[in-house]
Amino acid sequence: MAHPRGELGQLDVPLTPLAPPPLAPQPRLAPLPRLAPLKRFSRLKALLPVGLNLLLAAAFSLPSPAPARQKPPVQPRIGVWLTNSPSPLYYDPARLDQAVADLADSGFTTLYPNVWSRGTTFHRSRHAPMEPALAKANPNLDPICRMTRQAQRRGMEVIPWFEYGLMEPGQAAIVSEKPEWVLQRRDGSTAYPMHGQTMVWLNPAHPGVRERFIGLILEVVQRCGVDGIQLDDHFAWPVELGYDPYTRQLYRTETGREPPDNHLDRYWMKWRRQQLTSLLRELRQRLRDFDATPAKGGRTPRRERVISLSPGPFRFAYNRWLQDWELWSVGELVDDLIVQNYAYSVKGFAKDLDQPALVKAKGWGMPVEIGILAGFGGRTPDMATLREKVLLATGRGHGVIYFYWEGLWGLHAGPEGGAARRAAFRRLHQEIRSGLPGSR
């Protein structure tokens, strides 16, 4: 990883204001695929066919309905992102085991290991090549499965992080093998400068892309028995893309019109945003189908896996990356929201906790954690500053997720050093757990 998460907004392509809505009648968008009704809306849907007279009669003849069943309160997480770069963690079994033991001892409840980066995986996959350094060092290590076993027996959860989402390096084999999967700009270009590399973006609307992406996720869930999966700001559709032959034809088929030349046309944006949401709905359903089947040799279904999302700020995500994470959250397409807040000063951090989307998210009945920079490169806050930030977040009922592992007490721990910071994190987590209903 070239820089801290949350700097995705610093792009070569500027964000320009949205175009005003056209006056001409707009195409009717195709409906999303029909799936099982979502829990929050199933009761309402069941009432819609009932005639008005029946409803009025029932209102006077039946007792008041019981209030809607509320989900049990979910306790805040104390988690950390783990990556391979820059860190030797994934390549050494003894180091990996010790890291998990130290994290458990220090009060962590959830681990978010990077499992998909730069077109390669950190597990044996039939959909993509293994990360070259891991394949060279120890192709049989399978660090995600090993980490999961070690963490779960210590009472922690493991939620692998699919960091690169739908991005691929421009030179990846899949790009040359399946050029029809790649999104294009209106001028036909595909290159997307990102993290100092030339990347391309695979098409969320293409059936082949969808099957491969969901397959990457399901094989980790099935093989390693993880507790969920995480998507982030790379699970997106960049707003200037979508003029490739496949997307043009799909838009014509569904709307009877050509894609507008203006990539900021709001109805064109809405249609593409809908395609991305459709992919997430399909992933949600496939995970539910998997979890509903009995475990091998067992009689009971598996528990439902968590879909965690760590997006950028809402307005930027909605307009630039076509991510509607408010809809995804309210519609139960995601279960856990981690809002990145990497402001270096305590004052800036506190201000960002008051952003409207974050305040609104607290009312959605789902856990909302705050991503906090523990240390990366030359940016390592001292423990006093970190403590202030953590207590600000947990004081408002949020959990905290640190970026990243080596910034806790490892390579990027700063001048305070490893042993002192590890002891300080242990004390801090004991302190915040004593002030919360609990943690998970």
Residue locations for each model-derived region?
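Aromatic-lined carbohydrate-binding/catalytic grooves of carbohydrate-active enzymes
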Residues: 108-141
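The substrate-binding groove and active-site-proximal loops of carbohydrate-active enzymes
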Residues: 82-90, 127-140, 196-211, 265-275, ...
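Active-site-adjacent "subsite" loops/lids of carbohydrate-active enzymes
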Residues: 75-78, 85-90, 165-219, 223
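Glycoside hydrolase catalytic-domain groove-lining segments
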Residues: 251-294, 298-379
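Catalytic domains of carbohydrate-active enzymes, especially glycoside hydrolases
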Residues: 95-120, 224, 396-399
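Aromatic- and glycine-enriched glycan-recognition loops and surfaces
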Residues: 88-106, 132-152, 212, 274-282
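Substrate-binding cleft of secreted/luminal carbohydrate-active enzymes
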Residues: 335-349, 364-440
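Aromatic- and acidic-residue-enriched segments that line the glycan-binding/catalytic groove
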Residues: 124-135, 166-195, 233-260
